[in-house]
C-alpha cells in the first residue's frame, strides 16, 4: 500500500485542477521519495470536455489516469450520482493500494464569488465520510483498511478557490473550457478572476 500517494477525482473543473497542482506540490516537497505522477480518476460523466483535450493540462500537472474499467451504461452519464462516482473511484484507489482520495468538490455559488452554500458543503463532507466507511468495510478484499476520502475545498467559495489557484500557479488557462468563451465554466471563472482583480485572467 502507498501511504504517500493520493488519488484525485478529476472532472476537469477548477477544483480538480487546483487539487492536482496541490498534490504535485506535496510530491515535490517529498524529494526523492515523492517522485512520480499523481494518479487521477476521471469522472467521465461530468468531464467538462473530451478527455483528449486535457492532455496538455495533465502533462503540465504531472498526472496519470488510473486504469479504469468503464461501465458503458454509466460511465458517461451526466446524471450519475456524484456519490456513486466517488465510491467507484475510492474502490479503484483501494484496489491499487492508494489509501488517500481527494474529492475536490466545493460549494461556491455561481455568480456570487464570495459566497458558499453551507448546506451543500455539509452534504459533500457527509458523502465523503460515508464512502470512506463503506470502502473500509471491504478491506478484507482490498487490504486497504486505512482508506480515507478528503474534501479539502468543501467549504470554499469561488473566490477562495480562484485565489488558491493563483497562489499555486495552476495552469488553468490550459483547460479546454478556458479557451471556449461560450462555455459555462469559462463564464463563471472569468467573472471570478475579474472580481478579484486578476488582470491576467484572459
Regions found by a protein language model. Give the residues of each.
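Cys/His-clustered metal-coordination modules, chiefly Zn-binding fingers
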Residues: 150-202
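ATP-dependent adenylation/nucleotidyltransferase module used to activate substrates
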Residues: 1-171
Amino acid at each position: 500500500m502507498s501511504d504517500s500517494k493520493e488519488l484525485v477525482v478529476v472532472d476537469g473543473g477548477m477544483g480538480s485542477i487546483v487539487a492536482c497542482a496541490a498534490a504535485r506540490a506535496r510530491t515535490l516537497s517529498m524529494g526523492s521519495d515523492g517522485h512520480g505522477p499523481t494518479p487521477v480518476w476521471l469522472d467521465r460523466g461530468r468531464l467538462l470536455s473530451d478527455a483528449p483535450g486535457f492532455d496538455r493540462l495533465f502533462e503540465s500537472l504531472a498526472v496519470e489516469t488510473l486504469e479504469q474499467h468503464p461501465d458503458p451504461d454509466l460511465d458517461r452519464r451526466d446524471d450519475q450520482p456524484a456519490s456513486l462516482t466517488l465510491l467507484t473511484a475510492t474502490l479503484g484507489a483501494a484496489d491499487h493500494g492508494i489509501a488517500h482520495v481527494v474529492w475536490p468538490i466545493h460549494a461556491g455559488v455561481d455568480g456570487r464569488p464570495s459566497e458558499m452554500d453551507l448546506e451543500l458543503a455539509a452534504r459533500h463532507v457527509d458523502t465523503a465520510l460515508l464512502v470512506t466507511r463503506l470502502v473500509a468495510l471491504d478491506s478484507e478484499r482490498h487490504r486497504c483498511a486505512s482508506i480515507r476520502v478528503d474534501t479539502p475545498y468543501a467549504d470554499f467559495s469561488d473566490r477562495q478557490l480562484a485565489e488558491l489557484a493563483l497562489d499555486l500557479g495552476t495552469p488553468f488557462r490550459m483547460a479546454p473550457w478556458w479557451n471556449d468563451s461560450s462555455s459555462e465554466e469559462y463564464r463563471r471563472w472569468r467573472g471570478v478572476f475579474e472580481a478579484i482583480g486578476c488582470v491576467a485572467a484572459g
